[in-house]
């Protein structure tokens, strides 16, 4: 499943692509604790695509929905407000976590 599937047609006219990452997202849903996933950014929002047992799941976040992004021990950590908490991406297979975190944090300010 191609999780980096965002195209120009998905963007608002004012949006431009930013960095993206693929890897393993650590997030508990029922009895599963990790999923293959991707984060894709634009200058206006962040997309999260996840392979949930062969089914694509997409969630879109405004930057106002994100507290911060950081890199710890080669893992990307996205911190969301209360409710979702922190989601880690480990085993990053494409993209640069430091560049990604810096881009997201720049959009927050």
Regions found by a protein language model. Give the residues of each.
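Hydrophobic transmembrane alpha-helix bundles
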Residues: 16-25, 54-58, 95-96
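Anionic N-terminal interaction surfaces
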Residues: 1-39, 81, 103
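Phosphoinositide-binding peripheral membrane targeting modules
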Residues: 27-92
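Terminal and domain-flanking low-complexity segments
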Residues: 95-109
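Generic structural signal for short, solvent-exposed loop/turn connectors between secondary structure elements
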Residues: 1, 7, 70-76, 94, ...
């Amino acid at each position: 499943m191609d999780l980096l599937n965002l195209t120009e047609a998905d963007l608002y006219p004012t949006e431009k692509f930013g960095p993206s990452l693929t890897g393993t997202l650590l997030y508990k849903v029922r009895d599963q604790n990790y999923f293959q996933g991707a984060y894709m950014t634009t200058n206006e929002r962040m997309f999260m695509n996840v392979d949930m047992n062969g089914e694509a799941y997409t969630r879109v976040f405004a930057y106002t929905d994100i507290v911060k992004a950081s890199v710890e021990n080669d893992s990307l950590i996205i911190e969301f407000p209360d409710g979702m908490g922190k989601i880690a991406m480990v085993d990053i297979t494409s993209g640069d976590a430091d560049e990604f975190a810096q881009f997201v944090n720049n959009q927050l300010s």
